[in-house]
Amino acid sequence: MRCKMENQYIIKGGTPLKGEVTIGGAKNAALGILAAAIMTDETVTIENLPDVRDINVLLQAIEGIGATVQRINSHTVKINGSTIGNITIDYDSIRKIRASYYLLGALLGKYNKAQVALPGGCDIGSRPIDQHLKGFRALGATVTIEHGMINTFADSLVGNHIFLDVVSVGATINIMLASCMAEGRTVIENAAKEPHIVDAVSYTHLRAHETEADL
């Protein structure tokens, strides 16, 4: 039985390809880098951002915690984290884009405390983030879950050897962000290796955090 295809691409070859094309930035790479940008009090300029909903929603969440966000154009933004006055990421931001929880690792790393709504509201089992929390605890943070909110705080964060039970892009980025400001060295084993992970590593290395990826 053949499935009826309502939409098709019909390609007729035999003609040499020529011309130019501009490749846009990767959304998943941009999300991690935008979260990391709040960790410094200097102004960070990020170029070649894709002009898509998820990016704009995360920028709104970053503004919501008090950071300064200046849109230069649809693909360039300046972020300054020195004006942050709120360490809570509310459920509305998480509901719109799950990657808002990257701000949890960034805020924990910068201020040793952060609060974020569970991605599934009060239902932690909907899309579990246990590997994120495991990593934060390994760095020395106390993690509690109350009334649909994840609360993290630490007197100080200390590097550790962390093994992820499952490969997780989100956990890898979140733990990496938190560990950037921790004392000592952190090793994340069984980490995700997607290209946007490498981009986030490259950014943190550029910001003078000594970060390496063994691929």
Where in this protein do the model-derived segments appear?
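Conserved small/polar residues in nucleotide/adenosyl-binding loops
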Residues: T204-T211
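Short, Lys/Arg-enriched N-terminal segments with co-localized hydrophobic residues
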Residues: M1-K4
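Active-site cofactor/substrate anionic-group-binding motifs, chiefly glycine-
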Residues: R71-I72
